Amino acid sequence: MNLFDKKHLVTQADALPGRNTPMPIATLHAVNEHSMTNVPAGMEIAYFAMGCFWGVERLFWQLPGVYSTAAGYAGGYTPNPTYREVCSGQTGHAEAVRIVYDPAVIRYEQLLQTFWENHDPTQGMQQGNDHGTQYRSAIYPLTPEQNAAAHASRERFQSAMAAAGDHRPITTEIAHATPFYYAEDEHQQYLHKNPYGYCGIGGIGVCLPPDA
């Protein structure tokens, strides 16, 4: 694979080797002071990739029922990659967000609605002006129920796009969750720490129809 080819996913054989040591991050979420790693009893986890993770993380931490969020890397091969390595296209990872949520307050389907309505899922290996495999649109389900909901929502959103006159095919990857690696601490809750920082996400003006 061309080292500078960022429109095609690297193979596992060609991916960077990575490291055994996770990135050190703060113990508590900078916005709500909840644990960055623990999952309280009764709560569930969701993983989404929809472009630059700075804006994506903020989008989800603002939702009622979301306990914590974290920026990281998912869907690739390299263990515990650095931001620079992910941006090289040589890890296979997407910039992703880990969401710990209370299903008694917010359903997975509501998280999917936020996902579909707040980015462009047709752009392949980019999102807006951000180009590279790390910016691809992806859902990484953890359970058969999440997987079924993700696929059903993609079909509904594709139909809603067609009804709105947008016939571009959705390129969102839906694949069973592989290990999630936390990004460096400077990327965690980035837009809380840097309120005027870059946020490159935006929807296409189509709403996800409700599930039956």
Swiss-Prot record:
One of its GO terms (molecular function) is L-methionine-(S)-S-oxide reductase activity. Its EC number is 1.8.4.11. It is an enzyme of class 1 (oxidoreductase). Keywords: Oxidoreductase. It comes from the Bacteria. One of its GO terms (biological process) is cellular response to oxidative stress. SUPFAM superfamilies: Peptide methionine sulfoxide reductase. One of its GO terms (cellular component) is cytoplasm. It catalyses: L-methionyl-[protein] + [thioredoxin]-disulfide + H2O = L-methionyl-(S)-S-oxide-[protein] + [thioredoxin]-dithiol; [thioredoxin]-disulfide + L-methionine + H2O = L-methionine (S)-S-oxide + [thioredoxin]-dithiol. The keyword Oxidoreductase applies. Disulfide bonds: none annotated. The active site is at C52. Belongs to the MsrA Met sulfoxide reductase family. Has an important function as a repair enzyme for proteins that have been inactivated by oxidation. Catalyzes the reversible oxidation-reduction of methionine sulfoxide in proteins to methionine. This is Peptide methionine sulfoxide reductase MsrA. The lineage of its organism: Bacteria, Pseudomonadati, Pseudomonadota, Gammaproteobacteria, Enterobacterales.
